[in-house]
């Protein structure tokens, strides 16, 4: 009987755990939708900003533009901005981004370049701190989806890092959101910016939809058309000053988009992990129930045999 009670308690424990994992899955799926809505809400400003910037680029393409954020230096030290999460229970999300950062650091070391980390997220901070890695700055990753104010603060730190000469190039390592079951760590150069390649960059917007009763993700390419600036347009300020004011905004937008993708990737990974955990819990309950029924049947049979033998 004690064995039957142990199995019954185990079944109840697994059922309670399944309730928790199912709740976490639903919360993560709702937050993924919120992340999508935030991407779409920031899209109009990003499109107009990029359009004006591209228009200025065309206006200044034959001029010698002096802008600190465009200045190409001899690279001796590289700053690596790593976007990770604060919590676990999200599959291999954090370990994949950490492996990518370590692999990039190994590549830079092989090239004879120094490097330093700017870490976002407690998981990355804990990992690299334990290994005495060269860390310049650390930031907590907000539990909610990133807002422009939070990202603007991070951009200011990155700009100060670059403009002070502490690093000669800044690279961003984040997780690109591909689908609800797939994401991949990528590396993107943040600074210095290269105006010659900006007009060729296409953006992407992801949308969370329902398909066949399940969540699905669609992505669409967004090409930004340059803002038409008349050649005889007279600026109240020097166009170079306008460019210097717009580039930090453009950098903030780039960082915001990457941060939103990383957040969506983490939430999707957590949703998948909790869905798998719920499925495993259901399978375990079935197995335990079968074991319970067999043990109960064996117990009843044993009692009958004892009664018959006693008679």
Swiss-Prot record:
GO molecular function: ATP binding; proton-transporting ATP synthase activity, rotational mechanism
Keyword Transport listed: yes
Top-level taxon: Bacteria
Bilayer topology annotation: Peripheral membrane protein
Disulfide bridge partners, by residue number: 67-138
Compartments reported by the entry: Cellular thylakoid membrane
UniProt-listed SUPFAM superfamilies: ATP synthase (F1-ATPase), gamma subunit
Stated regulation of activity: Thiol-modulation by raising the activation threshold of the enzyme upon oxidation of the cysteines, thereby preventing wasteful ATP-hydrolysis.
UniProt key word Ion transport: yes
A GO cellular-component term linked to this record: plasma membrane-derived thylakoid membrane
InterPro entries linked: ATP_synth_F1_ATPase_gsu, ATP_synth_F1_gsu
Gene3D superfamilies recorded: 3.40.1380.10, ATP synthase, gamma subunit, helix hairpin domain
Keyword terms of this UniProt record: ATP synthesis, CF(1), Disulfide bond, Hydrogen ion transport, Ion transport, Membrane, Thylakoid, Transport
Subunit text: F-type ATPases have 2 components, CF(1) - the catalytic core - and CF(0) - the membrane proton channel. CF(1) has five subunits: alpha(3), beta(3), gamma(1), delta(1), epsilon(1). CF(0) has three main subunits: a, b and c.
Record-stated family: Belongs to the ATPase gamma chain family.
Job of this protein: Produces ATP from ADP in the presence of a proton gradient across the membrane. The gamma chain is believed to be important in regulating ATPase activity and the flow of protons through the CF(0) complex.
Protein name: ATP synthase gamma chain
Organism: Arthrospira platensis (Spirulina platensis)
Taxonomic lineage of the native organism: Bacteria, Bacillati, Cyanobacteriota, Cyanophyceae, Oscillatoriophycideae
